[in-house]
Amino acid sequence: VDMEELAYDWEPWFKELIPMTGGPPSHDTFNRVFQLMNPTLFETCFRAWTEQIRKALPESVEIIAVDGKCCCGSRNGVNSPIEVVNAWASENRLILGVLATEGKGHEIKAVQDLLKGLVLSKSVVTTDALNCQRETAAVIVDSGGDYVLALKRNQPLMHQEFKLFLDEICQSALPGVETADKGHGRIETRRYWQSEDIGW
């Protein structure tokens, strides 16, 4: 339905490009076309198209947020809901890629597969704590990017080691930054320190 509404909203512009003697296609027509598409081929074409858009934009460091999502309304009585991972270039508001996972618990591999297909030079990739994995970091670096990976208690050993490392840093003379934000019914205070010592 959204595609049909978009076609009507942009009908004058579309008519400059293609003849639409019967008006824009209905949502049923869009549905039939999408059902006939090869998803893998569409993904390849979509990535090539977004890469061309990225090349046309002014060069700067790009923040790419990678996350998994559950598609609302995709569950039925038999099948689990569709799970996808996507890469979002936040400043340019551009989806760089979307990949369906093989179900719950397969997000890590899907994120790595998605990242392998992207050009990440001059990019900083951010992920949630689930994707704080050595293999994910290696894929990002191999593709020419940098990364910021969240670390939480879902990896208790790494979390404890890193906490001990940070306790030492915080007690040293290393300068830090503190921010406070109010939202979602709470006040969040964040403290930041940076160290180039990754040997811990």
Where are these regions (language model features)?
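An anionic, glycine-rich sequence signature occurring as long contiguous blocks
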Residues: K152-W200
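Generic secondary-structure signature for well-ordered alpha-helical cores
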Residues: P39, K116, G145, D167-Q171
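Alpha-helical structural signal in soluble globular domains
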Residues: G117, E135-S143, E161, F165
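Aromatic side chains
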Residues: F42, F46-W49, Y147, F165, ...
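Conserved, well-structured functional cores that handle cations and Mg-NTP chemistry
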Residues: V1-T127, C132-E135
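A short alpha/beta connector and helix-capping loop motif
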Residues: S80-V84, R134-R153
